Amino acid sequence: MSSVFGKPRAGSGPQSAPLEVNLAILGRRGAGKSALTVKFLTKRFISEYDPNLEDTYSSEETVDHQPVHLRVMDTADLDTPRNCERYLNWAHAFLVVYSVDSRQSFDSSSSYLELLALHAKETQRSIPALLLGNKLDMAQYRQVTKAEGVALAGRFGCLFFEVSACLDFEHVQHVFHEAVREARRELEKSPLTRPLFISEERALPHQAPLTARHGLASCTFNTLSTINLKEMPTVAQAKLVTVKSSRAQSKRKAPTLTLLKGFKIF
């Protein structure tokens, strides 16, 4: 048996080619995006991390008995969407995260969902998005009710979940797998559509800036060369990292993640 993130796969016998899915995690600084990403990849909870660190991680998953090569971009926007092309033209699906104990993060999630809706209109395609209320373990300090989350998700026609990165792994895994299912449905509808990968130096079709038409700061749809390169992460910063697991060795011992620089894992 060979083991990678996700379920173990047999080392012999014919294997169908894995579905490739790119998933971007969006949200305000402090909403718990990195904690959710690491929880999904390692079953562990992190208590400290660098909010300025942005990376893309690779995981081999099995969703509905189908192998999936999942790439997860843990974005590093601070308070509002910034330089959005790096994920809008890359991801097949999006997780928009807010913290149930932060009204500001909830308001920011509305901005991200609006951005995705505008991009869907611009590109004339459906963009799968899931709204995620994180830090359910902090429910006693709630500033956002579950009903408000349901209403916001309903407004944009997306799925809604409440979870906690520091509690059950299964709930976090379920959300990520639901994102894969949503992406898979859209890919099956238009299999020839391929997103622009971060490392490709290819210009996008010229369009008028969204800033001028919709007032979304720093989010434009011009060519990649027009983006403020000081704010956009370099290819080296937004590298694809494959992290292997020792999960097969022990069901009780969580795998060790060694390539997440800036994280403190417990």
UniProtKB/Swiss-Prot annotation:
Alphabetized UniProt keyword annotations: GTP-binding, Hydrolase, Nucleotide-binding
Single annotated GO MF: GTPase activity
InterPro entries in the record: P-loop_NTPase, Ras-related_GTPase, Small_GTP-bd, Small_GTPase
Gene Ontology CC terms, in alphabetical order: plasma membrane
Binding site for GTP: 27-34, 74-78, 134-137
Keyword GTP-binding in annotation: yes
Pfam families per UniProt: Ras (PF00071)
EC number: 3.6.5.2
Lineage: superkingdom: Eukaryota
Catalysed reactions, as listed in the record: GTP + H2O = GDP + phosphate + H(+)
Family (UniProt): Belongs to the small GTPase superfamily. Ras family.
Protein name per its UniProtKB record: Ras-like protein family member 12
Organism: Homo sapiens
